[in-house]
Amino acid sequence: MARFELQKLYIDGGYVDASNTETFDAINPANGEVLAQIQRAGKEDVERAVVAAEKGQKIWAAMTAVERSRILRRAVDILRERNDELAALETLDTGKAISETRYVDIVTGADVLEYYAGLVPAIEGEQIPLRDSSFVYTRREPLGVVAGIGAWNYPIQIALWKSAPALAAGNAMIFKPSEVTSLTTLKLAEIYTEAGVPNGVFNVLTGSGREVGTWITEHPRIEKVSFTGGTDTGKKVMASASSSSLKEVTMELGGKSPLIVFDDADLDRAADIAMMANFYSSGQVCTNGTRVFVPNALKAEFEAKILERVKRIRAGNPEDENINFGPLVSFEHMESVLGYIAKGKEQGARLLCGGDRLTGGVFDKGAFVAPTVFTDCTDEMTIVREEIFGPVMSILGYDTEEEVVRRANDTDFGLAAGIVTRDLNRAHRVIHLLEAGICWINAWGESAAQMPVGGYKQSGVGRENGISSLAQYTRIKSVQIELGDYASVF
């Protein structure tokens, strides 16, 4: 029997039954427990949500900027009041350690909403003089109804990253969470309504990307789609959104990011950064620095420091405050990660540690994979070229700066990159050469609300967070005023 009651769709300010009777299960990856049955939206439900969103958006956009800002700030307060409840639910649904969800996921999501709530009154047009008798003014107007499609690794945070700028700009949003982790997004919908967001301005449709996601991207009255997920799926979403009605898109896609350790680096700091860039959230972070480049002369020493730190990882029940490494998000994903590990072994990478499923005690019922480190990796190996999205680090040796920059950029992806060095000139010189949208120097992973994030190449289109993201949820209307006489050529 499921722990929670049947989860319905959230449309027009409240929970409603789906148009069909199909459901799917939310599974706790730490022990296989069925958390809830969730209704699967039908095509009719997408239309119902669009109609509700169109109605609510007109009310929302007609409010003053200060009114909208005040309501969103109230939602921030409720998020923070319910932080522990939401974190506990996120941990059950994703398997992420409670030490992450309680102190990072909900907190930083609320920070993003607070950031955009503060920017609402700053949405402005321009006045452009043409001559004494004429000028142009511009208006930044909301797009209307927009859609967000989330990934499974940061469910409520991604929902906030997408909905915060959308709602701040006066839009209504239809959000489809990942089928694997849907529960906290439904709670976010409750919070928006409680805060005073008009009915229909934030709707949640649960179900598969293949069906519900496609119906959303194809809908002619949805003006924009913001998607987070894998590159292959992102290409399909972008093609569907474009071919159906030339929708605007934001794509935050996959990565295979390089972390370059230079020969002057503090190796202890470099090892700490590499650990965070590979094993935080059990390796299920799109920006992970999974290709760790280390000078050949320092590789053995660096490997020893990594092994020392791997021993400090505390894997176990993610509801335990002392744990910092939980299961993967699902048993299906666990098998995918184990498949990549097997390929690493087959293709000649040297296994330093891990390489198997964790077993015994609490691990037997969960989707746990041991923190895994390969070394002596080469650029053509599958584990080096493809996104694994799990706790698998690949260490690669190099000899020169020119060589490592070339190899770091030799990828279809361009989401993130980082370097560790004491040389300030080298730091800026090299970071400017790396083909990636999110870069860190002597750090890894922090992504503040003010920081635009997004990828180069096949890692994405557009940006999330920062002031620029707010503009992407508006369109510009130009208006010319003529105060003088008008001369016709006819």
Swiss-Prot record:
Record-linked InterPro entries: Ald_DH/histidinol_DH (IPR016161), Ald_DH_C (IPR016163), Ald_DH_CS_CYS (IPR016160), Ald_DH_CS_GLU (IPR029510), Ald_DH_N (IPR016162), Aldehyde_DH_dom (IPR015590), BADH (IPR011264)
Pathway the protein takes part in: Amine and polyamine biosynthesis; betaine biosynthesis via choline pathway; betaine from betaine aldehyde: step 1/1
Molecular function, one GO term: betaine-aldehyde dehydrogenase (NAD+) activity
UniProt site (Seems to be a necessary countercharge to the potassium cations): E248
Alphabetized Gene3D superfamilies for the sequence: Aldehyde Dehydrogenase, Chain A, domain 1, Aldehyde Dehydrogenase, Chain A, domain 2
Residues where K(+) 2 binds: L246, K457, G460
Record has NADP as a keyword: yes
EC number, UniProt record: 1.2.1.8
The keyword Phosphoprotein is assigned to this record: no
Residues that coordinate or bind NAD(+): G150, A151, W152, K176, P177, S178, E179, G230, T231, D232, T233, G254, C286, E387
Binding site for K(+) 1: I27, D93, V180
A GO BP annotation: glycine betaine biosynthetic process from choline
Cited SUPFAM superfamilies: ALDH-like
Cofactor(s) required, per the database record: K(+)
Active site location: K162 (charge relay system), E252 (proton acceptor), C286 (nucleophile), E464 (charge relay system)
Keywords from the named record: Metal-binding, NAD, NADP, Oxidation, Oxidoreductase, Potassium
Cysteine sulfenic acid (-SOH) modification, residue list: C286
Cofactor, free-text remark: Binds 2 potassium ions per subunit.
Catalytic activity: betaine aldehyde + NAD(+) + H2O = glycine betaine + NADH + 2 H(+)
Taxonomic superkingdom: Bacteria
Subunit structure, interactors included: Dimer of dimers.
Family to which this protein belongs: Belongs to the aldehyde dehydrogenase family.
Function of the molecule: Involved in the biosynthesis of the osmoprotectant glycine betaine. Catalyzes the irreversible oxidation of betaine aldehyde to the corresponding acid.
Name of the protein: Betaine aldehyde dehydrogenase
Gene (name only): betB
